Amino acid sequence: MQRIMLRAKLHRVTVTEADLHYEGSCGIDEDLLDAAGMREFERIELYNVTNGERFDTYIIKAARGSGAISLNGAAARRAQVGDLMIICTYGPMSEEESATHKPKVVLVDDANRVKEIRKFPA
């Protein structure tokens, strides 16, 4: 049997841009993607800490070192610039893998720069 498990999360990142008229997606600074092991075009779930909205979309790369978290297209209706978000990826794992798996958690500062990377739970 396969279980769908949390792989990684970007914890309490700040939305820096919302563009309703872009095709769609979520732009994420490449430094954050690398830190979390996330990939461009990967499906993500987003949880808006500020207003409680929960939704999904996919990743596109934003400029490395920019601190960018941009919500595009319909996702731009779910958050405003300045909102705090949790961005998660999930993946299938065997029973054996899931028994010992520890998701990666990336904590950031106020400018969306990596502050700490740890395995969950700490």
UniProtKB/Swiss-Prot annotation:
UniProt keyword terms in alphabetical order: Autocatalytic cleavage, Cytoplasm, Decarboxylase, Lyase, Pantothenate biosynthesis, Pyruvate, Schiff base, Zymogen
Pyruvic acid (Ser) carried by residues: 25
S-S bonds: none
Broad class of enzyme this protein falls into: lyase
Cofactor: record remark: Binds 1 pyruvoyl group covalently per subunit.
Superkingdom of the source species: Bacteria
Biological process (GO), any one: alanine biosynthetic process
Predominant subcellular localization, coarse grouping: cytoplasm
Catalysed conversion reaction: L-aspartate + H(+) = beta-alanine + CO2
One Gene Ontology molecular-function label: aspartate 1-decarboxylase activity
GO cellular component term, pick one: cytosol
UniProt pathway annotation: Cofactor biosynthesis; (R)-pantothenate biosynthesis; beta-alanine from L-aspartate: step 1/1
Active site: 25 (schiff-base intermediate with substrate), 58 (proton donor)
Post-translational modification: Is synthesized initially as an inactive proenzyme, which is activated by self-cleavage at a specific serine bond to produce a beta-subunit with a hydroxyl group at its C-terminus and an alpha-subunit with a pyruvoyl group at its N-terminus.
Subcellular localization: Cytoplasm
InterPro entries: Asp_de-COase-like_dom_sf, Asp_decarbox
Residue sites binding substrate per the record: 57, 73-75
EC number in record: 4.1.1.11
Named cofactor requirement(s): pyruvate
Assembly notes: Heterooctamer of four alpha and four beta subunits.
Primary role: Catalyzes the pyruvoyl-dependent decarboxylation of aspartate to produce beta-alanine.
NCBIfam families documented for this protein: panD
Family stated for the protein in its record: Belongs to the PanD family.
Name of this protein: Aspartate 1-decarboxylase
The species this protein was found in: Bordetella avium (strain 197N)
Lineage start: Bacteria, Pseudomonadati, Pseudomonadota, Betaproteobacteria, Burkholderiales
Gene: panD
